[in-house]
């Protein structure tokens, strides 16, 4: 036995669409105040792209690029998620796949001199720890402590310059640990 359904009248389908449209419109209107809060929450996130180098040691100089995603917990404290690609360039200047390392890690920063009305610059003290992922002849755990200048941190694009001390604890036999001064320049978005 086959049961046949009656076709729905057109006014019922139209009523259903109107109800659905009204609910969608109401949800958008009620979410409008939340968008302003989300925008202020997004203002706490920043991304930095940078280049850095260190002083030569044992005929080797580190040079690399980094990506730093940071979140401001308060006006002074920030959390950082870091990714660094570093080449350990020997004295002859040759770069090979085996003398590079990609490190992931995190860190903390404290704004020691926040921006003021007269001066838009800020100075941050940062500490970070990263460790090599994947296979590399230069596997290491890197520890950094530095002072960073951030030009106008309230702007969407700000220059960032850092100087500090870096220590790389190599896990490969035959490699001496690296320690020395480093300089970093970049841009904050």
Where are these regions (language model features)?
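Cleavable N-terminal export/targeting peptides
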Residues: 1-43, 189
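Gram-negative (and chloroplast) outer-membrane scaffold detector with strong preference
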Residues: 68-157
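Short, highly charge-biased, low-complexity peptide segments
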Residues: 162-170
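First exposed extracellular module after export/assembly in secreted or surface-exposed proteins
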Residues: 40-43, 51, 100, 160-163, ...
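Solvent-exposed loop/turn segments connecting transmembrane beta-strands
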Residues: 52-63, 92-98, 131-142, 169-178
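Outer-membrane beta-barrel "beta-signal"
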Residues: 105, 112, 177-189
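Short glycine/proline- and aromatic-enriched beta-strand/turn motifs that initiate or cap beta-hairpins
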Residues: 35-86, 184-188
């Amino acid at each position: 036995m086959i049961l046949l359904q009656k076709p729905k009248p057109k006014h019922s389908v139209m009523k259903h669409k109107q109800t659905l449209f009204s609910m969608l419109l109401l949800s958008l209107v009620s979410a409008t105040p939340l968008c302003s809060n989300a925008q202020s929450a997004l203002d706490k996130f920043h991304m930095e792209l940078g280049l850095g180098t260190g002083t030569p040691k044992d005929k080797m100089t580190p040079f690399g690029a980094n990506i730093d995603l940071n979140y401001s917990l308060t006006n002074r404290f920030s959390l950082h998620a870091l990714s660094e690609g570093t080449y350990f360039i020997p004295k002859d200047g040759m770069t090979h796949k085996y003398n590079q390392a990609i490190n992931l890690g995190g860190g903390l920063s404290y704004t020691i001199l926040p921006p003021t009305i007269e001066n838009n610059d800020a100075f941050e003290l940062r500490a970070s720890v990263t460790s090599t992922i994947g296979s590399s002849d230069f596997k290491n755990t890197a520890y950094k402590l530095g002072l960073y200048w951030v030009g106008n941190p309230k702007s969407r694009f700000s220059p960032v310059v850092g100087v500090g001390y870096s220590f790389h604890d190599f896990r490969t036999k035959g490699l001496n640990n690296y320690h020395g001064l480093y300089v970093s320049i970049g841009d904050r978005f």
